[in-house]
Amino acid sequence: MPPSPRTPSLKGQVLTCLLFVALAVSATALLHPSPKFTQWHSGQPISLQLSIAGAFAVLLATGAAIVLHVPALCRLVRVPATLMTIDLSGTRPWIVGLCAGIGEELLFRASLQPLVGLWVGAIIFAAAHARTAMLGSPSIVKRSAYLLNVAAAGVALGLVFEHLGLVAAILIHASIDVIGLMALRSVAARSAPKSAA
């Protein structure tokens, strides 16, 4: 199914990731003090970062599975019709989630956060998600609530970056997006009209 003009395409997501990586490398090279890129590889040992990110992903996936398989909980999930039109077939949730995790964490956490701080970085991160908020709901209240949640996620990911490291922030961010998109795909499949046999 071709994407509508309002829904993000896979190509657009990958290009955005590449743009964010290029901006992160440029901003770090131009604006960070020497030695450059130290924030990119500092933090806790990689094994600890991988373990914590993996545990987070397992807990998140378990929670999503419970919600999707308990009818009383699943009925509480409300997905706007505009989000139901996003093509999430095949490996798209994985590609989009990994691209967002890598590109956004390199730009917003590794590059910008050391320059502007945790809170301003989280606000910039939320502002970068304004288009997604517009896809989600026509209501200004719901859009604002979504952006506040994204800002809170930006603070949480910023703390992960500061206390654990970039690898953990990338993997936690990617797991949120991948699991969220796969859950959206599941909800969309259940909501799709059944074809007559």
Residues of each region from the PLM?
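Juxtamembrane helix-loop-helix connectors linking adjacent transmembrane helices
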Residues: 2-11, 15-17, 28-100, 113, ...
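Transmembrane helix-loop-helix hairpins at the membrane interface
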Residues: 82-197
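Alpha-helical transmembrane segments of multipass membrane proteins
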Residues: 19-27, 56-64, 104, 121, ...
